[in-house]
């Protein structure tokens, strides 16, 4: 059984995956293609934003729908401390005008986003849509004009933030979401010159290996 939240169907009978694509679309299509008995359930939420890109599925891909009307979960912006700001200062020295960046979640990426105010013509190819990105776009810092693909468009897989962010991405043609197999494909990422990835680390060993998913009991 696979269940995911979707928007109400449009006039053509397509629902939208909204705030998160990840592997939902490919899981549903792979289940259909396998020929095995699998149930696909869509939770229709009329408060789910509609986000463009490869983010649509026809109602025929689902076996059942259930209706719900509840607000999206909201997450406040992380407030970087002095240490995070100093680390971000070193990171910002490695980011140049016209670079395409990927941003993770956490205090350091948040500090980096805040420090990009002096840059211009930045592009975004990322898994997570950063919470501070709408400000960068409105100020002309992020234009996506120099990317070899999806010019003028921010490409991501999911977003988690506050209501202002959800209102921003809703039916906004400069934001497109795609499955993670597309945004996170190393071969696709490698075709972007001057690609910069900024993520948090939970631990680093003496050989320089970095762990970012778990550290002892912390995940």
Model-derived features with residue positions:
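Conserved alpha/beta enzyme-core scaffold
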Residues: 1-218
């Amino acid at each position: 059984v696979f269940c995911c939240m979707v928007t109400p169907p449009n006039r053509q009978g397509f629902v939208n995956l909204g705030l998160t694509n990840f592997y939902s679309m490919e899981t549903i299509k792979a289940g259909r293609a396998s020929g095995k008995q699998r149930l696909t359930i869509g939770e229709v939420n009329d408060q789910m934003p509609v986000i463009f890109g490869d983010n649509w599925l026809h109602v025929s891909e689902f076996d059942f729908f259930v209706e719900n009307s509840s607000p999206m979960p909201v997450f406040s912006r992380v407030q970087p401390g002095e240490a995070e700001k100093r680390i971000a200062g070193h990171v910002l020295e490695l980011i140049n005008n016209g670079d395409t960046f990927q941003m993770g979640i956490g205090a350091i990426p948040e500090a980096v986003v805040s420090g990009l105010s002096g840059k211009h013509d930045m592009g975004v190819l990322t898994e997570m849509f950063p919470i501070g990105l709408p400000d960068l776009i409105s100020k002309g810092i992020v234009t996506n004009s120099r990317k070899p693909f999806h010019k003028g468009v921010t490409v991501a897989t999911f977003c988690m933030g506050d209501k202002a962010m959800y209102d921003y991405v809703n039916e906004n043609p400069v934001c497109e979401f795609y499955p993670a197999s597309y945004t996170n494909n190393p071969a696709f990422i490698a075709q972007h010159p001057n690609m910069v990835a900024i993520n948090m680390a939970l631990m680093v060993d003496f050989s320089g290996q970095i762990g970012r998913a778990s550290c002892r009991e912390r995940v």
